[in-house]
Amino acid sequence: MASNNVAQFAAELKMPAGVLLEQLQAAGVQKASEDDALSETDKARLLDHLRKSHGATDGDKRKITLTRKHTSEIKQSDATGKARTIQVEVRKKRTFVKRDDVAEGAEQGQAQVAEADDDAELKRREEEARREAELLEQQAQELLERQERLEREEAERRAREEAAEAERRRAEEEAAAKRAAAEAAAAQQAAAQQAAEAKQEAPGAQSAQEEARAAAERAAQREAAKKAEDAAREAADKARAEQEEIRKRREAAEAEARAIREMMNTPRKAVVKAVEPPKPVEAPKPAEAKGTLHKPAKPAGAGVQARPAVKKPAGATPATTQAPAAGAGDRNKKPGGGKGGWQDDAAKRRGIKTRGDSSGGVDRGWRGGPKGRGRHQDSASTFQAPTEPIVREVHVPETISVADLAHKMSIKASEVIKVMMKMGQMVTINQVLDQETAMIVVEELGHRAVAAKLDDPEALLVEGETSSDAEQLPRPPVVTVMGHVDHGKTSLLDHIRRAKVAAGEAGGITQHIGAYHVETPRGVITFLDTPGHEAFTAMRARGAKATDIVVLVVAADDGVMPQTKEAIAHAKAGGVPIVVAINKIDKPEANPDRVKQELVAEGVVPEEYGGDSPFVPVSAKTGAGIDDLLENVLLQAEVLELKAPVEAPAKGIVIEAKLDKGKGPVATILVQSGTLNRGDIVLAGSAYGRVRAMLDENGKPTKEAGPSIPVEIQGLSEVPGAGEEVIVLPDERKAREIALFRQGKFRDVKLAKQQAAKLESMLEQMGEGEVQNLPLIIKADVQGSQEALVQSLLKLSTDEVRVQIVHSAVGGISENDVNLATASKAVIIGFNTRADAQARKLAEANGIDIRYYNIIYDAVDEVKAAMSGMLAPEKREVITGMVEVRQVFKVPKIGTVAGCMVTDGIVKRSSSVRVLRNNVVIFTGELESLKRFKDDVKEVKQGFECGMSVKNFNDIVEGDQFEVFEVTEVARTL
């Protein structure tokens, strides 16, 4: 829905309308209320304003770097006088910075906006510019007034201070003059006294008195002049200090005004300037004599790394910071006016900086250290052992590889392997350990092991499952029809649904689990039809898990059978009520009373006997008793008070899953609570995806499915496992994360189980000798059939012949399956699937046997026959005759020959023989020769004499008996 006003746009952005109005006004879009119309231009201006306020800039390149390389050759004589040619490569790099990008971009943007906007937009912008100019002018005027006020106040204060200072100086001068006059009067008085005394003493003393008076006057004048000079100096210092303070205040005010103007003119974005680390001060290089070949001596302390430069104070001027840099640049210049020789290249090579070396390559090498320090005493590379061991807390998941476990403990994987070898287990670096073993290894290495499930997204899924506030409404019951094979379950459902499903099933037996919902006058019922064959145990267990009521179908002419007992066990395990339907009552041999007695023996007691299970006689053929059965089912549902939320995310269970060649993974699910809509994101085990299509049991598209409704969905990432829980999530990213986690967890657990079973299987094979394997690849149409067929074939394994399932999956037979069969020498079994054209050609070329079946009986019987052919044949002995020794002859180079009489049966040349003496077997072997007179014969019959010799046996005496027998091989069966 397009947003036409401010309120709709705020609802679309999921934010308050008041906040949106403030942002629009900040962007210059004048909107007064939530009902004002909003155009695309207004939205574009708001977006541009938000981008600028968050610091978004264009990513165009602003500088170009050009690198030039020039190669030349110079000739230099070495110490021996030979001329050497040296390649000199000069590289120059120049960077051009485009500084007017911002201005050009602003001009282009203004030009484009000016062309695109209408007259009203131009007037509005002019008004905004005028207001901004007035605001800036007002701020500048206020700043000027503030400066003038400060200057006026400063001038008045300075005038007051100057007047006070002048008054103080005048008072000091008057006091000094008074003191000088007093001193002069005292001096005159003293001089007068001295003159009087001098007159009395000598007439020549008058001249001395005058000189003393003149000296006193000069001293007084010097004292007064010195005091006046000190006062003038103090006044000048005060005036300079006041002027400096006024100048600083003026500069601060100007800086503040400049900052305000920049803030008003620049967009609101903050660019944090990266703080450059202080560069270490390089020691000055000694001047090298040009043309010298020897290595100049190092000055004292050259090997010591220079201390880092002291940080500059905040108020340092640029002049003070640039002077040392300029000096350093002068010191780093090459001698000889910048023309470098080959000795400069050697110095560069010596000064190359390596990783971890901050000294610029100085003193590198095992001879480079200062005097008194060896090559192993370098402080930069000396290893210091930790003072105490570090004990880490290691979180051990359910499965972890040796490499990951070592990484968690911050040690090498070889250390973990050593510990495992000491514990008697040989492991590799990629081997997966179970949680218990890994925790033992962690404790053995001195760390603390904690069993934890880290980064488990399923924990977040469980935490997110809160009690739904949706209203609990009545839902239809889910009824599972169970019973023995051929007892009429599907036929009963066909009569209820007015359909004919049983006629279309191979062999007349159900091999898939089916889900249907039927609308009756009293309400809706959802039926699950489960297979009755013994191979489909897991499928029946899934049906009992997802059901509310079990309808147990028992044939009146057959009674309780093994799968009937199993269905009763499934229903009791799930705590599900049972409604017994005694089917085929229209047959003459039907005996419902016998069925009731057999069911009572299994713990299912009818209501007429005081139990809680209703028994309903029905006939799927004539339809008798169907209405009573449905009424009993709905009555049980009313007693259970089945309720589920409707307006909530859907939850359910996978009834069946398959891989369709055109549709991809398809899953039949039963919604248990909530409503499943087309487009929802679902998670089913390790599969996830968006519901692209949703079909009901009749193959018709539907948009939603409520509680207890079975639907077929498409759009999953892979075929989910039958029986997996289905849940609707709001975020596809979260669904993918949980699905990938489940896949990895399943793979790790599977690898751990395989690793644990390797040794056991190896010991079993060593104890049992050679075991024949029948490798099979199974492809089925749906998940349940594939699971049932695999379990049925694995049950055929014996101690001598084992069924090895190389691969089993859902879908058609592809080239990958044929290639896998070629590598593993396996037979491919397709259950209700076929191979495509490429797979058939590849199978014919490689001689791979592909067998197709649509009835599980046939597949099991043929695999059983193939296994029988692989059994070692049974050897049986058949006694063909008895011979009595009459005379013994010693023949040179031949040995002992017995003259015999055939007393019973027949003696053949290829037969084996036992030598009996006093009816005790003393030797078993083969005949070496059989003669009659001097001729070799093939056989001698009863009543004839013959000569016989036994291979490798000469201890024959008269009276011995030879028992002649043959060994025949008899084929065995399973």
Curated annotation (Swiss-Prot):
Residues 619-621 are annotated as: G5. Residues 358-371 have a biased composition (Gly residues). It comes from Burkholderia vietnamiensis (strain G4 / LMG 22486). Residues 483-490 are annotated as: G1. Residues 121-133, 146-181, 210-261 have a biased composition (Basic and acidic residues). InterPro entries: DNA-bd_dom_put_sf, EF-G-like_DII, EFTu-like_2, IF2_assoc_dom_bac, IF2_II, IF2_N, P-loop_NTPase, Small_GTP-bd. It is found in: Cytoplasm. Its main location: cytoplasm. This is Translation initiation factor IF-2. Residues 474-643 form the tr-type G domain. One of its GO terms (cellular component) is cytosol. Residues 508-512 are annotated as: G2. Belongs to the TRAFAC class translation factor GTPase superfamily. Classic translation factor GTPase family. IF-2 subfamily.
